[in-house]
A protein has these predicted regions:
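Trp/Phe/Arg-rich N-terminal binding region typifying the photolyase-homology
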Residues: 1-161
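Glycine/tryptophan-enriched, flexible segments
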Residues: 123, 142-276
Length: 276
């Protein structure tokens, strides 16, 4: 791996610092850039909402703040992954690229996989497993065994601080503040309450769930009236990757040793396979 290359860490559904393999491995040489690709067409697609966009805003603000503690920051590229690849090539730079697998399977197959397949012809590309995703395993009989094995692996180390985060002007990105102004806050909010995003919010939900809210989870998770209080409320955080599924799994195993809600937590453990 050439020493003059810049490591580029691509964020999509892994908006966290802790137990983020792409971020850790991309930070080892301490010469890296962290980029979130904001694709307007993706956010205009079916299943996307203004609520999700504001949840993303929280996640990105917190991620940027945490990256600044590492002498780095979150840069924003506006466009799809094909346009991002063209920008890479046009910059004439030398890069190593780091990705995590995405749980957004359709988008991953159509956009991110295309970028990876093109980029490996020109750059060093590193793709890491995330959340138990098994994209090449067609034998589903072994799926749960492999999932358990991945969850029981050690979490990766925290990322290294950045020593060189100079911005290549040929490679066009914008600041997070500008993204929020032109692409997020420009949408009118037609709601009052929204679930806060970010790793800190995810950690608080996890702790209150283990401490008290999980009581009668196995019964009340299907109740429209009670589920809001007795479910983990972590699905959005798993979807955006603000908290590592492996971290939750390991913390759950420790909690099961002493919890007075063991039967409820065992039900939760089964549903972790589906990120609920």
């Amino acid at each position: 791996m050439a020493s003059d290359r810049t490591d580029i860490i691509i964020f999509h559904r892994n908006l966290r610092i802790r137990d983020n393999e792409a971020l850790y491995h991309g930070s080892i040489r301490q010469k890296y850039r962290c980029i979130y690709i904001f694709d307007p067409k993706y956010w205009q697609g079916n299943g996307k909402s203004i609520r999700q966009l504001y949840f993303l805003k929280d996640c990105l603000i917190e991620l940027d703040r945490n990256l600044k503690n590492l002498n780095s920051k979150l840069e924003i590229f506006i466009g799809d992954y094909k346009e991002f690849y063209k920008s890479l090539v046009n910059s004439n730079g030398q890069y190593n690229l780091y990705f995590n697998h995405s749980t957004d399977i359709n988008y991953y197959n159509s956009q991110i996989s295309s970028l990876i397949n093109n980029a490996i012809k020109k750059y060093d590309v590193n793709v890491f497993r995330d959340f138990g995703v098994q994209r090449t395993n067609i034998n589903r009989d072994q799926w749960s065994k492999l999932w358990d094995a991945q969850m029981n692996e050690n979490m990766c180390d925290n990322p290294m601080p950045n020593k060189d985060c100079r911005i290549d002007k040929k490679f066009f990105t914008i600041s997070l503040d500008k993204l929020i102004k032109i692409k997020i806050d420009s949408h009118q909010r037609d709601f009052i309450k929204i679930q806060p995003g970010g790793s800190e919010a995810a950690e608080k939900l996890l702790n209150t769930f283990f401490q008290e809210r999980c009581h009668n989870y196995r019964i009340k998770m299907s109740s429209p009236m009670d589920a809001v209080d007795h479910c983990s409320r972590l699905s959005s955080h798993f979807a955006f990757g603000t908290i590592s599924l492996r971290y939750v799994y390991k913390k759950l195993k420790r909690e099961l040793l002493t919890s007075k809600y063991k039967s409820d937590l065992y039900s939760f453990k089964k549903r972790l396979y589906w990120h609920c």
